[in-house]
């Protein structure tokens, strides 16, 4: 009987722990990255925000802010274009490999909301559900797709945004970057402050699937949550030399 009671207690304790963990896509705090796109700043970028309640919030990027409101059970669209504030030149990451200071988009709301992110131009379109900061992890594997060999602007890519200052990140890319600054399968470290984005793009025909990204502890500070996005600037699907294709754009799950 004692053994049976002990097993029941362990099961109940585990259930309570699982119930206490909130993995919902609803939240009050989000980090968005717009990774590189074959059309650069010409690309149109939009955020779609909804909630079952009325909500008020602020979008911040690159020192600019954009207040917004959400009516319950309706969708609010925030467009980041060259004619709005902030402009998409503040938000899109065009660095081949390197750090974009304050390129992370921070969304804060007074009420739980759901956020979707979209980047497009002409017939090319990519979108992702955005995970709230409370469910972000510290360790990720990248999924991507081969870029187009014959196009200099077609690259496999991933990007990392820090949610806190002094975030130390270790990265082991599955392929070298387009500038050959970071060899394949060799771990390197970067340090990011809150809102900074590190983007990594492959050479043509590259595929960064399998790249490993981990937030690590520093002296006197624990490892910190990060958001990771991946995809391609442009890919042809099923036919490597096709004349049409799409960018791929997805936030990674921890």
Model-identified regions with their sequence ranges:
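Extracellular lectin-like interaction modules
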Residues: 21-254
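Bacterial Sec-dependent N-terminal signal peptides
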Residues: 1-24
């Amino acid at each position: 009987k004692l053994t049976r009671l002990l097993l029941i207690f362990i099961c109940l304790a585990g259930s309570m722990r699982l119930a206490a963990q909130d993995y919902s896509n609803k939240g009050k705090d989000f980090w968005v990255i717009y990774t590189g796109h074959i059309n650069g700043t010409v690309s149109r970028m939009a955020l779609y925000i909804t909630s079952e309640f009325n909500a008020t919030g602020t979008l911040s990027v690159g020192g600019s802010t954009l207040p917004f409101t959400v009516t319950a059970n309706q969708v609010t669209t925030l467009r980041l274009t060259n004619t709005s504030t902030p402009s998409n030149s503040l938000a899109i990451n065009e660095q081949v490999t390197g750090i974009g200071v304050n390129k992370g988009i921070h969304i804060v709301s007074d009420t739980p909301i759901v956020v979707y992110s979209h980047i497009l131009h002409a017939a090319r379109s990519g979108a992702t559900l955005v995970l709230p900061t409370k469910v972000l992890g510290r360790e990720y594997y990248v999924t991507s797709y081969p870029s187009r060999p014959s196009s200099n602007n077609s690259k496999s890519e991933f990007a990392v945004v820090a949610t806190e200052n002094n975030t130390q990140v270790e990265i082991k890319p599955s392929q070298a970057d387009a500038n050959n600054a970071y060899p394949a399968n060799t771990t390197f470290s970067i340090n990011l402050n809150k809102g900074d984005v590190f983007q990594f793009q492959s050479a043509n025909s590259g595929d960064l699937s399998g790249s490993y990204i981990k937030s690590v502890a520093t002296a006197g500070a624990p490892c910190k949550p990060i958001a990771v996005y991946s995809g391609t600037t442009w890919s042809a699907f099923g036919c490597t030399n096709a004349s049409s294709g799409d960018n791929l754009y997805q936030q990674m799950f921890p």
